[in-house]
Amino acid sequence: MKTYKKLFMFCMACLSLSVASAQTFTSYTTTESESWKAGKQPMKGKGNSTPLVVVSGNEEGVIFRAWGTTFNELDWDAFNQLTRDEQDEIMYNLFSPDGDLHFTHGRVSMNANDYARSWYSCSEVSGDFELRYFNIERDKRNIIPLARAAQKYYPQLQLFMSPWSPPAWMKINQDYPVLSNRLNKQDPRKDYVLYMDEGQSADPDEMKLLGDRSGVFPRRLALQDYFIKDPRYLQCYADMFCKFIDLYAEQGLPITKVMYQNEAYSYTPYPGCAWTAAGTLLFNNEYLAPTLAKKHPKVELWIGTFNTNRLDYVEKILDDPTLQKNVKGVGTQWECRNNLPQLRKRYPNLRFMQSESECGNGSMDWKAGEHTFFLLSDNLGNGCDEYYNWNFI
């Protein structure tokens, strides 16, 4: 209510100034060469064009609920290169209700993602099915402090979590990446297990930016799950999700949503895990959903994050009637935004989230800004009610 009152008073003040200054108002424009240029514009008493949008009051649409950003180890390293005043300015502008962006949510990964300093998991003891040695000590040093810096300006911060890779000991290749390359230590002889043929390297589109890819992505689908589908492993992994939620709650950071896997269709040389449709349904329906319902009934299970434009493959998962009962919504990013119009129409009872804004190559130029504006317009216009930035520093 206070925010609306301030907005009303500000608008009235602007109106008074306009009237007092011969019916003019101050406009601000930003171009590629100049930012926030102020100028005086005359007030027109009568419009000279037809309305672009006519609202009758009977329209139905999606209510936008929240947006936020991601907390990563390398973000924390960059954050610590700043002065305390610079840190406070950034977090105020991102998270304060009186700041610029008004972020209210954040994203974290269980175990290492591709913006970790090095690869790790919360469970490094092979065969620890009782999770005696499961811990978030690495998060306490490098991720939780960054989230707390955000909480300083928005104490009600909520998180959603998805892993990039299970612990290496839970995967058939016993390593964090899916495929080998010159930047990791995986034995290249293991690469054949993805497609079950010799000599197959990574998808040539895998490490390209979205605009440089063409056709369907991925070009080929994994023929087997990289997660070991033994019941002990599957149940232990579901228990890890709940343990992670517990430990973050002890740090004053509530996780309110989880997804089983980040980008299951990127067969990466960094932490990742390939899943088939059958494996996805098995883990979510028979292990993760019931375990969450028992231990954390208020935490929402979403399915994702989908990063493929293979609509038929996504529908193969979402058409499952048991899954539809178990999940609250769908996380989409990168290629999957091409499927949003069809998915919204086919699954009207599910919510949709844009779970990772395309960060590009960090050029921070006008073209990148236009692309981000397009992403916001495209995802929100096609029904996403939450939107998550990737790195914010």
Which residues fall in each region the model found?
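Extracellular/periplasmic catalytic domains that process cell-envelope and extracellular macromolecules
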Residues: 59-64, 99-101, 152-154, 295-296, ...
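Active-site-proximal beta-strand/loop segments in catalytic clefts of secreted hydrolases
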Residues: 70-74, 108-112, 162-166, 260-264, ...
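Short secondary-structure boundary/capping segments
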Residues: 121-126, 174-180, 274-276, 317-318, ...
